[in-house]
UniProtKB/Swiss-Prot annotation:
Similarity annotation: Belongs to the EF-Ts family.
Primary location class: cytoplasm
PROSITE patterns from the UniProt entry: EF_TS_1 (PS01126)
Function: Associates with the EF-Tu.GDP complex and induces the exchange of GDP to GTP. It remains bound to the aminoacyl-tRNA.EF-Tu.GTP complex up to the GTP hydrolysis stage on the ribosome.
Top-rank taxon, per record: Bacteria
Name recorded for this polypeptide: Elongation factor Ts
InterPro entries: EF-Ts_dimer_sf, Transl_elong_EFTs/EF1B, Transl_elong_EFTs/EF1B_dimer, Transl_elong_Ts_CS, UBA-like_sf
Region (Involved in Mg(2+) ion dislocation from EF-Tu): 80-83
Organism for this UniProt entry: Clostridium kluyveri (strain ATCC 8527 / DSM 555 / NBRC 12016 / NCIMB 10680 / K1)
Keywords: Cytoplasm, Elongation factor, Protein biosynthesis
Subcellular location: Cytoplasm
GO cellular component: cytoplasm
PANTHER family cross-referenced by the UniProt entry: ELONGATION FACTOR TS, ELONGATION FACTOR TS, MITOCHONDRIAL
Transmembrane regions listed in the UniProt entry: none
Length: 306
């Protein structure tokens, strides 16, 4: 019988994941030494040693079905920009983006347990572990999203060779080549301006209340009377909408138009209303703290095998 203590001890000795340790122990009939060999053979122990290292580089990739009705976006991280352009790494991220578009998984954990799209003898997790062992860097599937539309289309935009990725979902009752042009323009807008919300109607009350409080304190700190401060808040809220809500933003290609006005003009050309129903923007490594190390320390760690 495999006990929790056995799994814990093996994990401490190898650094491998809990489930991997449990599987190895079962395969080894409870023999810890044999389980270590199994983990090493699978590259899991070696991968685990790298798992504590910060992976803030990587790629954002998208995939769109031929009919433009289904799309996916994924971010996979690695440690260096050198590995981020490696053909094997790029191929893995491309394949993963396609797999996500066909998948019903909603979490990275679920996706990791799926059979890998280009080699169903391995799971996504096993394929990633093999890639970690081959390229010698920690890697992680960080996040992904999937969009689908029945009437309309989805378009993507990748900026900086995978530094920023965007999906934009348009809804329209009529099919038109103009939709693709509009979606691409909006996707570039999202990449450039990083809006927080689709429209002012989608700004949640907690965020709005917080911003109003900040604006009021700012006005009072500027020496404005209470009543004047309240009027200033109204103006600054409108400015906040214009800066952070996609529909309210000035179009980067023509600052005489807002995105809303641009959509209305294109809707007339198509002969039916065009609506942005969703957008997703991933920026590689955003929110991940990058670890800075000096060269001497890096060499020392390599010599010590860390």
């Amino acid at each position: 019988m495999i006990t929790a203590q056995m799994v814990k001890e093996l994990r401490e000795r190898t650094g491998a994941g809990m489930m991997d340790c449990k599987k190895a122990l079962n395969e080894a009939g409870g023999d810890s030494e044999k389980a270590i060999e199994i983990l090493r053979e699978k590259g899991l122990a070696a991968a685990a040693k790298k798992s504590g290292r910060i992976a803030s580089e990587g790629l954002v990739k998208t995939y769109i079905s031929e009919d433009g009705k289904v799309a996916s976006i994924v971010e996979v991280n690695c440690e260096t920009d050198f590995v981020a352009v490696n053909a094997d790494f790029v191929n893995f991220v491309d394949n993963l983006a396609k797999q996500i578009s066909l998948s019903e998984s909603t979490t990275v954990e679920e996706l990791s347990e799926e059979k890998y799209i280009s080699d169903d003898s391995k799971t996504v997790s096993e394929t990633l572990v093999n890639l970690i062992s081959k390229l010698g860097e920690n890697m992680a599937i960080r996040r992904f999203e999937r969009l689908a539309v029945s009437k309309g289309l989805i378009e993507s935009y990748i900026h900086g060779g995978g530094r920023i990725g965007v999906l934009v979902k348009l809804e329209c009752e009529k099919e038109s080549e103009i939709l693709k042009e509009v979606a691409k323009d909006v996707a570039m807008q999202v990449a450039a301006t990083n809006p927080l919300f689709l429209s002012k109607d989608t700004v949640d009350s907690a965020t709005l209340d917080k911003e109003k409080e900040i604006f009021k304190v700012q006005a009072l700190n500027e020496g404005k009377p209470e009543k004047i401060a309240e009027k200033i808040v109204i103006g600054r809220v409108q400015k906040y909408y214009k800066e952070n809500c996609l529909i309210e933003q000035l179009w980067v290609k023509d600052s005489d138009l807002t995105i809303d006005k641009y959509l209305k003009s294109k809707s007339k050309e198509v002969g039916a209303p065009i609506k942005i129903s969703n957008f997703i923007r991933f920026e590689k490594g955003e929110g991940i703290e990058k670890k800075e190390e000096d060269f001497a320390e890096e060499v020392r760690k390599q010599i010590e095998g860390k």
